[in-house]
Structures are given as structure tokens and as C-alpha cells.
């Protein structure tokens, strides 16, 4: 096995901070996430990493919740990539269009290269009943998609899931094709799981499974949303669902991912599992 990684990066999923009482039934401790983030940053700052990515749900609700959680991120010395999850849109309707900018994102979906690897961030909130105000065409289209999934009896026909539109799918397809032409392996990241089948999965995720299999260069898809975590392999792609930081009163969860030519190493901290995933 190759001894030195191509690159290393940190992963955090679902801090879901809010100044709110715990939800004991789901074991979620919203206020504790700031201290958990600070603890995670203390560890990650001591590691040689190319960047740290947070896989959505920085907050549980309320626009003002962004201030303390983003202030905590100032303690992270590494480059940081943020993306929204469903809870990041639990804000006033007039703020919905500002969420991506509040997270410092260059666009709702985008890609970048590090260490010869192409990283792609997708936005599964695009087609959802929470990311656009009621009465807008995008909200109506999302409601129609959800109604169709409900009629089919789809297990992921939930108001707290979402999907991607045709424009974003075409962009993703073109991005993977360009990476393949350049000889780049790809890691795709999003909030919603795609595989194995689960009630938390992205609407229409089967299209992405098929696209990744056809592309042949997507080594991993990394996500949050399902706080208990999950793991699967479909074709040549690993699907890794990282555990949610907001869960449990005191136990933290985050990870360092190492990419090698022949494998992916996940070094889990706290509740997160360590894994070796052969390529």
C-alpha cells in the first residue's frame, strides 16, 4: 500500500447550532455544538490538512444562529468550505436567498482542485419546499416533485429532503466529463445521502448513482443529513455518510480523510468510525 497520501482534509457534519433547549427524544444538544466545534478545530488545527469541509446544517434554525457558529469557525486555521443543509433554510422567507452568501460560498454548486483531485460541491436544497418562498415557481416545482414521490410511495418523500434541478445536473455531468478528460479522480460532496437506500436520501438520487457509475472517475461521495451515519459502495464509488455533531450531550464526531492512489483512509474522532476503503 502507498505510504504517503495525495492529500488530507477534515470533515464535519451537522453541527446544527441554535440557542435552544435539547431535543431529548432525538438526543440533540443544540447549544453544545459551539464547544464541539472548538474541540474539533483544536484537533484539526494540529493536523496537516488541505482544507476542512462542513457538510451542511451549520444551524438548526433562526438567522441569528449563524453569527455564533460562524464566529467559532474563525478559530480554524485551515481553508474552510461550507454548504447549507435543510436546517440552514429554517429562517425568515426574505432571508432564504441569502443563505449561500452567508456561508461564504462562491455559488450554490461549484468545484475546485486540490492535490490533483477534483472536488465537487452539489446543492441538494435547490429543489425543496424550504429553500424558496411559497408562491415562487421553484417552490411550486419542488412541491410537485414531492407530491409525485409521495404518490409513488418513495421512502424519501419527506419535506426535509430535496433534489437537484436539470441545470445543476447538466453542470455536474459536464464537470465530471472535464475531470475525466483531464485524468482527475473526483470526490463529490453534498448534504443529502445517495446510497444505500434510506428515508434521508436526495430526491432523484438514482440519476446521480447512474451518472457516477457511467463517469467511472468518482471515487467517493461524502454527505451528512442522516445523523446516525451510513456506508455503501455502488459501482466504483464509495458513499460515506458522516455522523451528526449535534447528537449526544458530550460525545463529539468529526473526521480526517486521507486520499491515496489505492485507497481512502477515514480517521474518525469521537463517535465517527475509522475505515479503510480500497479503490
Regions found by a protein language model. Give the residues of each.
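Short, solvent-exposed loop/turn segments at secondary-structure boundaries
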Residues: 23-25, 64-65, 198-202, 278-279
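N-terminal active-site segment of His-dependent metallophosphoesterases
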Residues: 1-67, 167
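Solvent-exposed loop/turn segments at secondary-structure junctions
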Residues: 15-18, 58-61, 86-90, 125-128, ...
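Short, high-confidence coil segments that cap the C-terminus of an alpha-helix
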Residues: 49, 183-184
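Extended active-site neighborhood of metal-dependent phosphoesterases/phosphodiesterases
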Residues: 63-182, 207-217, 232-267, 278
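Active-site neighborhood of phospho(di)ester-bond hydrolases with catalytic His/Asp-centered motifs
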Residues: 11-13, 52-57, 80-86, 122, ...
